[in-house]
Amino acid sequence: MKEHFQLKETIVTIVADDQSYIELAKESIAVHRLKLEEYIRSDPYFKVTLEPYECSSDAPEVVKRLVAAGNSVGIGPMSAVAGTIAALAVGSMVDAGATSAIVDNGGDIAFLNDRPIVIGIYAGQSSIRNIGFTLEPSDHIRGICTSSGTVGPSINFGCADAAVVFSDDVSLADSAATELSNATGIGHEGVENAFDTISSIINIDGAVVIQGEHMGMWGTIPQITRADMQYECITKG
């Protein structure tokens, strides 16, 4: 079953086999959003910095994950916020016994799947469309996160229609996708050179960039397949 859920700026699609798991995911989103909001009230700089950040050992788990991801990539902690909220929500479902759980937070997706699934990529006005990836079953939570310089409201300094990163660390995938998108220029060279910004980061499996009519790949990526993308079905803010 699938449910669309919004809490303030957080807009997600939650997929699970039982409604009770979906309710747990919604509770997790509310709890961790509140903890993040409280932390930002105590230090507003955390929300706006585009640079690595240090937090205390008693910071909330959501803050620690954001900081670790941003610091690994070399950018600000809020670069990982969507993926981190998604990962914590999926984690709450898995802890309760779910063997199949997906949270799509505006294109930053955390998932555990006990059957093959296809995740499509929306690349705006690019001529490269209706592509997706087949994700084989796994026994641990994974992430596929997408950032764009042409789609969506997030701060972005690049030209990517879609910069996609795969990692078992969902927060890291989100931060790295942001950095990859920021680094993407125009044309084949602009796409290929962008991968230099993330190629040395540990625990990133692979990445894909779509820019206009150009598409580049780096590392290990899942099998590419056709995915008929319907705009109205995309989780977006």
Curated annotation (Swiss-Prot):
InterPro entries: ApbE-like_sf, MA1715-like, UPF0280. This is UPF0280 protein Mbur_0309. Disulfide bonds: none annotated. It comes from Methanococcoides burtonii (strain DSM 6242 / NBRC 107633 / OCM 468 / ACE-M). Belongs to the UPF0280 family. Gene3D superfamilies: ApbE-like domains.
